[in-house]
């Protein structure tokens, strides 16, 4: 098993409903360690840059508007197969299709406001982590 790092966002809808602690508990209960975190209110430019790969898609404007509608939590998680483990904890992108007990099933209202984001691969995780965190901000958990 490989120790990996993945990137996670708790989106504005879940932050507004005070689900941060409950979601962090899910990460830690699943064996993922939080090695960096911070609260941000994305600017339009930051959101457009982060989601640039979707810029030609019809939902891009709504996504940027949603992601700038309130504070978010960004965090780096570390653990065995962290990318897959995190995505399993999140559940399906559409909360209506997410398995009971997953973050999206429990905390999300719709596919547009689905509580959280998780990297889909180790490579995208590295890119997404670097977008929000410097190397100095990552704190290895040695104990």
From Swiss-Prot:
<feature type="binding site">
    <location>
        <position position="93"/>
    </location>
    <ligand>
        <name>ATP</name>
    </ligand>
</feature>
<dbReference type="GO" id="GO:0004550">
    <property type="term" value="F:nucleoside diphosphate kinase activity"/>
</dbReference>
<feature type="binding site">
    <location>
        <position position="11"/>
    </location>
    <ligand>
        <name>ATP</name>
    </ligand>
</feature>
<keyword id="KW-0546">Nucleotide metabolism</keyword>
<keyword id="KW-0479">Metal-binding</keyword>
<dbReference type="InterPro" id="IPR023005">
    <property type="entry name" value="Nucleoside_diP_kinase_AS"/>
</dbReference>
<keyword id="KW-0963">Cytoplasm</keyword>
<dbReference type="GO" id="GO:0006183">
    <property type="term" value="P:GTP biosynthetic process"/>
</dbReference>
<keyword id="KW-0067">ATP-binding</keyword>
<dbReference type="GO" id="GO:0005737">
    <property type="term" value="C:cytoplasm"/>
</dbReference>
<dbReference type="GO" id="GO:0006241">
    <property type="term" value="P:CTP biosynthetic process"/>
</dbReference>
<dbReference type="GO" id="GO:0005524">
    <property type="term" value="F:ATP binding"/>
</dbReference>
<comment type="similarity">
    <text>Belongs to the NDK family.</text>
</comment>
<feature type="binding site">
    <location>
        <position position="114"/>
    </location>
    <ligand>
        <name>ATP</name>
    </ligand>
</feature>
<comment type="subunit">
    <text>Homotetramer.</text>
</comment>
<keyword id="KW-0460">Magnesium</keyword>
<feature type="binding site">
    <location>
        <position position="87"/>
    </location>
    <ligand>
        <name>ATP</name>
    </ligand>
</feature>
<dbReference type="InterPro" id="IPR001564">
    <property type="entry name" value="Nucleoside_diP_kinase"/>
</dbReference>
<dbReference type="Pfam" id="PF00334">
    <property type="entry name" value="NDK"/>
</dbReference>
<keyword id="KW-0597">Phosphoprotein</keyword>
<dbReference type="InterPro" id="IPR036850">
    <property type="entry name" value="NDK-like_dom_sf"/>
</dbReference>
<feature type="active site" description="Pros-phosphohistidine intermediate">
    <location>
        <position position="117"/>
    </location>
</feature>
<protein>
    <recommendedName>
        <fullName>Nucleoside diphosphate kinase</fullName>
        <ecNumber>2.7.4.6</ecNumber>
    </recommendedName>
</protein>
<feature type="binding site">
    <location>
        <position position="104"/>
    </location>
    <ligand>
        <name>ATP</name>
    </ligand>
</feature>
<dbReference type="GO" id="GO:0006228">
    <property type="term" value="P:UTP biosynthetic process"/>
</dbReference>
<comment type="function">
    <text>Major role in the synthesis of nucleoside triphosphates other than ATP. The ATP gamma phosphate is transferred to the NDP beta phosphate via a ping-pong mechanism, using a phosphorylated active-site intermediate.</text>
</comment>
<keyword id="KW-0547">Nucleotide-binding</keyword>
<keyword id="KW-0418">Kinase</keyword>
<dbReference type="GO" id="GO:0046872">
    <property type="term" value="F:metal ion binding"/>
</dbReference>
<dbReference type="InterPro" id="IPR034907">
    <property type="entry name" value="NDK-like_dom"/>
</dbReference>
<keyword id="KW-0808">Transferase</keyword>
<feature type="binding site">
    <location>
        <position position="59"/>
    </location>
    <ligand>
        <name>ATP</name>
    </ligand>
</feature>
């Amino acid at each position: 098993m490989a120790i990996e790092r993945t990137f996670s966002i708790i989106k504005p809808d879940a932050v507004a409903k005070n689900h941060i602690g409950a979601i962090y508990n899910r990460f830690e209960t699943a064996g993922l360690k939080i090695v960096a975190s911070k609260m941000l209110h994305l600017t339009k430019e930051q959101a457009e840059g982060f989601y640039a790969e979707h810029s030609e898609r019809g939902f891009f404007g709504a996504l940027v508007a949603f992601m700038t509608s309130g504070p978010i939590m960004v965090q780096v998680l570390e653990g065995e197969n962290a990318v897959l483990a995190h995505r399993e904890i999140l559940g399906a992108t559409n909360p209506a299709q997410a398995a009971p007990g997953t973050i999206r099933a429990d905390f999300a209202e719709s596919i547009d406001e689905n509580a959280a984001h998780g990297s889909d691969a180790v490579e995208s995780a590295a890119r997404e982590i670097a977008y929000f965190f410097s190397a100095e901000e990552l704190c290895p958990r040695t104990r």
